[in-house]
Amino acid sequence: MRTTILCLALIPALAAAQTAPQPAPSAPRPKKVLTPDQIAFQAQMNVYYAEHALLATAATSAYTAEMAREKADACPNATAAYDINLCLAHEDEITDANYRAFTAAVRAMLALPQPTFPGETTPYVGPTGPEATPATNTAAFDAAEAAWHAYATAECNAVDTLWRSGTIVNAMVGYCELRMARTRLHELNDAYEMLLYH
């Protein structure tokens, strides 16, 4: 009942608002004319975005391919140790190729110099320090990759040591290498998510 009364009371107010004179449209704003420097900057940004998109596509394609492989059982039809070892060696090669494609694309994205807006000084120094440059980005990426490779090698060497006396050693090392590379791909995808997907 209250709703009906409220609706009936609002009808005249809404009708009056619709029939009230509308303000005259404001004059159109003059179109901004870009300077030659701004036009050049826009062209440089278009090239930058196109290169960035190609590299992001390459990285995400390699990542997606490896994540699909990760969901499948590695070597489901291999039963003998020899067959398992051959299969895992092949699986490691494919994973390594996807890993190299992903990291090469991410590193190339980090190395892309972003065009500077006319009149802007670079690198910008913010409250926490200077902004990253292609040189600092790639140096940090290379250092992290070198540290990770050393860690992965040490981890799989420890697995090798544990299983050295048995015929299973090569399979265990193969699984270790697959696990380490895929875990690292997840880490890198998370670390560079904003670069890859935005």
Task: Kindly give the residue locations of the regions a language model identified.
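N-terminal alpha-helical modules
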Residues: 18-198
